[in-house]
Amino acid sequence: AKTYTEETGVPVTVVTAASGQYETTLMSEMAKSDAPTLFQVNGPVGLANWKDYCYDLTGSKILGDLTSDSYALKDGDATVAIGYVIESYGLITNKTLLEKAGYTTDDIKSFADLKKVAEDITARKDELGFAAFTSAGMDSSSDWRFKTHLANLPIYFEYQADGIGSTDAIKGTYLDNYKNMFDLYINNSTCAPTELAGKTGDDSRNEFLDNEAVFYQNGSWEYTNLVGDGKPFTDDDLTMIPVYIGVGDEANQGLCTGTENYWCVNKEADQADIDATLDFMYWCVSSDEGTKAMANDMGFVIPFKNAQESPNLFVKVDNALTAEGKTPVAWCFSTMPSENWKNGVGSALTAYAAGTGDWNAVVTAFVDRWKTE
């Protein structure tokens, strides 16, 4: 914003919300006479609260530069939100340890393959000196990886099978597959399932950094925590493979790629302010300075034609898989009913791992609470 003002003379004011307070801050800012002209939503559920404020971006220059229509949100025929950063997640893989166990990523092209490799590593864990998976921590710093990111896969495949993009009543068609993958994580890990309730995101990362496990479910945002100054890995040591759950065309499955960050323009603003906002957005994603700031300063991968090439290995893997014709798994978790719903699933998963709850409680939290919410 500062660089844009220096270049164009157009003042840009940025209001930053405290962590976890974006929606509350936006509500108070939108009630003011000088309400923001640019704001963001996290996906279809977030958009539902704000769609009456969203300017139709159809025909705008920024929409014309978007690399895929799947990164825009519509309300009827109107395009009302544009994803401005995309990320991928999957199984971050320590290739060196995998090779020590006698395998390469070419041996893992399905859930059945992954299960075979993981269980073989577990059988030889003492001899090898490492586990298959880092701890599937269910502390709040880590549980989103399972109650949200892993849970995305059964939702995505159900939507694909039913030809829909969201639903008021999830059926849970693929929850057995969700169970199989969660079981694989918790039974082939650095620790006992009963210890997972207290395990954190840092625990999981540190286990991976210390070569204690081959696989670590996380995303492209984790790259700088693993590679670079003072970090133990180089790009040659790591890769990312898809999260296979035994559904669909696994041979052609890509990483889970999408966004929870969409720009919207306030249609209540003066037209001159709307036009100035559209110019600023376009500058961010098309100019040399804007795209460099997005890529280098913020580490964003932006889904626009003029994007800078990312130095991030996991982004390169995603691009390579897509170029090979693999289908990325869309981020459908933005259609989950609420944080409350996710927490219900997380609590049920934690109890299941600890042995104090059964899988039926997970199914109830997933299916029944989706309907009631």
What do these predicted ranges mean?
Residues 11, 99, 123, 289-291, ...:
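Conserved C-terminal helix/tail region of periplasmic/extracytoplasmic solute-binding proteins
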Residues 28-29, 36-37, 63-98, 129-131, ...:
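A structural signal for short loop-to-beta-strand junctions that line the ligand-binding cleft
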Residues 80-84, 89, 115-167, 213:
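Extracytoplasmic/periplasmic solute-binding protein
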Residues 101, 190, 230-296:
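Extracytoplasmic/periplasmic substrate-recognition and gating elements
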